[in-house]
């Protein structure tokens, strides 16, 4: 899950629990993948060489870091205060693994459609969503948090024809309860595995990459996407917003 090494409600302790990539703690975790029997992704507070703190996640394999993602969208509303604690990441990029190209999003990132769009256009066949999702419902509708998150990830996997892994924490921290219910969705948006609510659990699931192929044949949205049109329209919108005209 998000910030899986530290917990979420860090406040003034954020700098105390931060670790550089070359720290013994991080290197020990990376070393567990050296034999090639497993790949590992985990969330932590990263301290950069410039001493900027990031809400970050590392994917490691065969004893090496394959990708570092720094959370881009930092919620600073309601119970969240990340904009005060962390620097903002600057990219959404897929990365190669022995299973194919993957992409990581951290919690609030998932709620921005452009994030998963960029990962899919960059070749990702699986979305890894690292989350600290509290029980509190979404908006005035009272939509349950679990239903909202599962619906969101299912939608993104379906429209992009890729797998989705939703990894959410459990437990209570500073009055906030996190519901767990981690789940895996196939490229058709169907839930194929789900963990229990409020209970730590290991899910072991085989993912058939043939389903990615089938999904993209049956609904070729990725093939038909017009990136150039999207870029042109975004440039036009930016000009209008900055007062430069259409």
Model regions and ranges:
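Short beta-strand scaffold segments in enzyme catalytic cores
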Residues: 42-44, 55-59, 93, 182-184, ...
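Hydrophobic residues at beta-strand termini and immediately following loops
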Residues: 69, 95, 167, 195, ...
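Active-site beta-strand termini and strand-to-loop segments that position acidic
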Residues: 95-98, 186-187, 207
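Short, conserved active-site loops that position catalytic residues or coordinate cofactors/metal ions
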Residues: 1-17, 129-132
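CN hydrolase (nitrilase-like) catalytic-core segments centered on the catalytic cysteine
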Residues: 21-41, 107-202
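A short C-terminal boundary segment appended to hydrolase-like catalytic domains
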Residues: 210-246
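Active-site catalytic loop in hydrolytic enzyme cores
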Residues: 21, 31, 48-126, 130-152, ...
């Amino acid at each position: 899950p998000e910030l899986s090494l530290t917990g979420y409600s860090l406040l003034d302790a954020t700098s105390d629990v931060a670790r550089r990539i070359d720290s013994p703690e991080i290197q020990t975790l990376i070393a567990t993948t050296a034999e090639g029997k497993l790949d590992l992704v985990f969330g932590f507070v990263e301290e950069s060489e410039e001493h900027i703190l990031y809400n970050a996640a590392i994917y490691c394999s065969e004893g090496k870091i394959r990708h570092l993602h720094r959370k881009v969208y930092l919620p600073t509303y309601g119970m969240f205060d990340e904009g005060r604690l962390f620097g903002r990441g600057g990219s959404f990029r897929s990365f190669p693994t022995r299973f194919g190209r993957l992409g990581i999003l951290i919690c609030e990132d998932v709620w921005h459609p452009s994030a998963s769009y960029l990962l899919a256009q960059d070749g990702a066949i699986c979305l890894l969503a690292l989350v600290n999702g509290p029980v509190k419902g979404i908006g005035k509708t009272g939509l349950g948090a679990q239903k909202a998150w599962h619906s969101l990830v299912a939608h993104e996997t379906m429209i992009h024809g890729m797998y989705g892994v939703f990894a959410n924490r459990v437990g209570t921290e500073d009055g906030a309860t996190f519901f767990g219910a981690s789940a895996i969705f196939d490229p058709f948006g169907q839930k194929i595995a789900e963990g229990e609510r409020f209970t730590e659990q290991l899910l072991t699931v085989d993912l058939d990459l043939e389903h990615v192929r089938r999904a993209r044949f049956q609904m070729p949205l990725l093939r038909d996407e017009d990136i150039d049109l999207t870029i042109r329209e975004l440039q036009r919108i930016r000009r209008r917003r900055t007062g430069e005209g259409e």
